[in-house]
Amino acid sequence: HLTKTETGIVFSSISLFAIIFQPVFGLMSDKLGLRKHLLWTITVLLILFAPFFIFVFSPLLQMNIIAGSLVGGIYLGIVFSSGSGAVEAYIERVSRANRFEYGKVRVAGCVGWALCASITGVLFSIDPNITFWIASGFALVLGLLLWLSRPESSNSAQVIEALGANRQAFSLRTAAELLRMPRFWGFIVYVVGVASVYDVFDQQFANFFKSFFASPQRGTEVFGFVTTGGELLNALIMFCAPAIVNRIGAKNALLTAGMIMSVRILGSSFASSAVEVVILKMLHMFEIPFLLVGTFKYISSAFNPRLSATLFLIGFNLSKQLSGVVLSAWVGRMYDTVGFHQAYLILGCITLSFTLLSFVTLRGGNRLLPTAETQSPA
């Protein structure tokens, strides 16, 4: 068993290697377009999930926490922290090419997460290794689906691409130009001060949740069932989220997500019963649809869509991981010294402050407006 500080070290290592790989994955994703080379790499690594966790990661953590953190950080940084973002960006790219909403496709991910949460909550109490082997098995199914899929651009998108309309050649220089855009840094302020702090809060929330039950095993089971119910609700909201975000605007969607995150963290600092932490856990399911859909729509409306993967993996995921390297270890130490409640009060005040600041730093009003970068030339 790891202490809260050691757990924070592991999460910091994952964040560190995500910092290294996410820029690479973002640039590769925008360069590859609809080609599946990167997805195949991620899928193969997912198939090795069980052997890695059982025969490599777990023994290393028991022998040496630093060595285990480094090896685990490399694998998890590639497959999950960077890989999941690359997959999200690929799905969003396919949705734009074929004129359907990303949020409606993401519903399947919510349902899958709900089923996994309920199953793993029980299986972890029996034998965690069962869960790892199931993950490798589903990765094989993913490989089959990836082989069968044939993503293509819509006919109109293909004609536009062939004529060269709206084309801006992808290059490292083009991506680097983002660093000179004030609106890019305004987006970073939101990601680091709100989304990143919230992610660090959520990393060890399961441990806080389990402390309200008679035994950790019972807490794990209840946490799994609550997550299942919440993710099913998440799926419903995610299906409706594109229409809601189109109406209120991407900026307001991100601000709404920030307020929900702040309420959940601050509420957790005052929670005193199992019922209260269950309700607070359910708030997560309202926040995720607004954050994900709002982020992609904000990127596509405020920046060049050809750099969507780079913006998502660097501007969103990488920024969260970069700040997470520092925050995870610091917050883990706070949990050990002042306890969950006091730490949550501090984190909640931080997210609320940055959410209010984002009213100024984020670009856009109530409606999504095209930019000069995304409009075709007259």
Where does each model-flagged region fall?
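A late C-terminal transmembrane helix in Major Facilitator Superfamily
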Residues: 306-337
